[in-house]
């Protein structure tokens, strides 16, 4: 432990997402060690937004001496499917690492192995821990997944963007405590009949 007066904040360097509005919603960019939940209805474009963000951050960190990779982990699509989407949106960066798994221990192992500048997990409802009972997307599983990701993010000082689905009534699928576990909750909304999308910050710690 250290005296609070000895702890400075000047060395906290936020990571730019490559989208000025996204950065603004996040208070200037992604804070290292933070966990941000991006919530929205299925099909609204959460995965595409975060894959574009992954490509942008990978491009910006390509020449860094350390933590010069971005890790995108999908529990919903295969590596080939993610690659096709990345090619379509211009996110084909050699230091953007893709993985497809629904196993929590594998997810944590990948983050610990590569120690990326940014880790993206898509989604909280598809990752499963073998240490607890319950189906994927259930309250017990989602809480365990979120808690483990938060612990890893804080320990390794690696920011994590976590996708979360929203139910028909507009609430985030899984336990309500999920919203209070993470550092930031962003709601991704849109009009089904237009290409207009809005990103709102609901909780920002």
Task: Label the predicted regions.
Residues 163-173:
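Canonical AAA+ ATPase core
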Residues 141-161, 187:
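Substrate-engagement module of ASCE P-loop NTPases
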């Amino acid at each position: 432990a250290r005296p609070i007066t000895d702890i400075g904040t000047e060395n906290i360097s936020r990571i730019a997402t490559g989208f000025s509005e996204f950065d603004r919603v996040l208070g200037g960019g992604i804070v290292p060690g933070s966990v941000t939940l991006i919530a929205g209805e299925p099909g609204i474009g959460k995965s595409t937004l975060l894959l574009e963000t992954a490509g942008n951050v990978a491009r910006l960190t390509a020449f860094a001496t350390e933590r010069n990779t971005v890790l995108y982990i999908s529990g919903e699509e295969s590596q080939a499917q993610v690659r096709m989407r990345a090619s379509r949106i211009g996110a084909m960066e050699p230091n953007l690492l893709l993985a497809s798994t629904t196993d929590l221990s594998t997810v944590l192992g990948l983050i610990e192995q590569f120690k990326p500048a940014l880790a993206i997990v898509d989604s909280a409802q598809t990752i499963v821990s073998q240490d607890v009972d319950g189906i994927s997307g259930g309250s017990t599983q989602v809480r365990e997944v979120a808690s483990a990701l938060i612990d890893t993010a804080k320990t390794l000082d690696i920011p994590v963007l976590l996708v979360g689905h929203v139910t028909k009534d507009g609430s985030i699928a899984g336990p309500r405590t999920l919203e209070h576990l993470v550092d930031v909750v962003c709601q991704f909304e849109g009009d089904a009949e237009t290409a207009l999308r809005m990103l709102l910050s609901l909780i920002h710690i």
